[in-house]
From Swiss-Prot:
Location of this chain's protein in the cell: Cytoplasm
PROSITE patterns tied to this protein: AA_TRNA_LIGASE_II
Protein name in UniProt: Aspartate--tRNA(Asp/Asn) ligase
Binding site for L-aspartate: E172, R218, H455, R496
Gene Ontology molecular-function annotations: aspartate-tRNA ligase activity; aspartate-tRNA(Asn) ligase activity; ATP binding; nucleic acid binding
Similarity section: Belongs to the class-II aminoacyl-tRNA synthetase family. Type 1 subfamily.
Residue numbers marked as site, Important for tRNA non-discrimination: H30, G81
SUPFAM superfamilies attached to this UniProt entry: Class II aaRS and biotin synthetases (SSF55681), GAD domain-like (SSF55261), Nucleic acid-binding proteins (SSF50249)
Assembly: Homodimer.
Domain of life: Bacteria
Lineage of origin: Bacteria, Pseudomonadati, Pseudomonadota, Betaproteobacteria, Burkholderiales
One CC-aspect GO term: cytoplasm
Matching Pfam families: GAD, tRNA-synt_2, tRNA_anti-codon
Amino acid sequence: MRTEYCGLVTEHLLGQTVSLCGWVHRRRDHGGVIFIDLRDREGLVQVVCDPDRAEMFAAAEGVRNEFCIQVKGLVRGRPEGTINAGLKSGRIEVLCHELNVLNASVTPPFQLDDDNLSETTRLTHRVLDLRRPQMQHNLRLRYRVAIEARKYLDEQGFIDIETPMLTKSTPEGARDYLVPSRVNAGQFFALPQSPQLFKQLLMVANFDRYYQITKCFRDEDLRADRQPEFTQIDCETSFLGEQEIRDLFEDMIRHIFKTTIGVELDATFPVMPYSEAMARFGSDKPDLRVKLEFTELTDAMKDVDFKVFSTPANTKDGRVAALRVPKGGELTRGDIDGYTEFVRIYGAKGLAWIKVNERAKGRDGLQSPIVKNLHDASIAAILERTGAQDGDIIFFAADRAKVVNDSLGALRLKIGHSEFGKANGLVEAGWKPLWVVDFPMFEYDDEEARYVAAHHPFTSPKDEHLEYLETDPGRCLAKAYDMVLNGWEIGGGSVRIHREEVQSKVFRALKIGPEEAQAKFGFLLDALQYGAPPHGGIAFGLDRIVTMMAGADSIRDVIAFPKTQRAQCLLTQAPSPVDERQLRELHIRLRQPEQPKA
């Protein structure tokens, strides 16, 4: 039926007869000669239909966009002046001898080359959307990334082992997707949030190096970089320390980027402690392309009359930080007002600022509504610590540390990536990877009045912090590490707990008693008693990596059939109701939401 792909018909086939199959991308009637741009997964080729072959020409007159057709014809060079340098096949055309309509198409709801389609339209008609060249490129790129990951891991001695999709619900973290059991009435499986426990069990079982490219499921609120089901390159290895694990998977990411998109990442990724990342950038996934950093001012603002600064400076969880923007004096009041509204999204109550017109004049060279509320020592500290120069602007955030980090961190990125930031060299092009390490082991949950695991409860504390598990859990740092690239966390992992007594101590620190621990994790605690080896691993978000490589706006652009931000599939209309008989078989009765009283 087909001898060549359309997009691969080039000058090497001149003078040969070919058989092509594909879709009509565009049909043009030029004064009795019909031109068809025929498309398949490899690209386009121009087909010329002359009227001297009456049966073929009649068929060509009847085809429309997205008809699926077969063409047989002669490859010839294009006439002078009609060469299309933008196409791989742009120097040739196919003179059609025979045209068969394999399947007609109704009028498509949109043109495939329309770049202004809403995401709703695209996802509703996903099959047609996937015919678009960009989507074809994205999914083939995804395939190549997966292949190169497999090649690398295979060369390093990793074994691809599947783990269960129907498993036990262990509600520590995001909500599980639950699957009712028909056979065991009233009991439920959960879809895995990750293969975490199974891959640890595989290490205990002496498989030494495991990986799989697998689906994971989390019932959480969605954002541009989240899906209810997502794909991980999931890895675990025994008898390697934290540094060795990071080196191994840093090499994997370098290999993938080089072989798939020809990018040479740094020979060595910088390593930054979590505390430093939060202090300098307000984020545990800093975008190092942006050349702006926080300046710590909390201690210098404790005794100022300006309560907006002094109150958080004297509060246990408060912070005062500054962000100096070189040449920011050019920003208009309208720009500043826009940034003020922007930081409110992140909980900030406002945005204080100082323009440095002439630093040598001290406070007289500063322009700001807040200068009058600051004493000379605090002003000197601001100018000295930020390194402010004439023509700069300094923005301030003062609140709970989380609000300061979130709001000023978001402002840093917004300014850095703005047209102003690009014009003034505040952002670099390219790829800026790093490792963020030494995360807190626990976070305190005020509502539950207990510590919760910052990563997951199977992460090992640093050796020197083991004693804090029982005396001061808040001081514990974890052997955890995230790989960050251009402000995205693309991978995260840790060294795991391999001794039962340490795992039990962690459960106690989390207020998980012995009975609860046995009920939820007894199989793990049992396995750890049989000479479990030191082990650790990492999981990479395949969707995120491909999104970055493709320059896509959302991971929905690199997944064949994604869900919306409301966790719905617009193509299949899932989720959907099921009939009463199915529910009865599962021993389930639906409880309808209560209607508000009139």
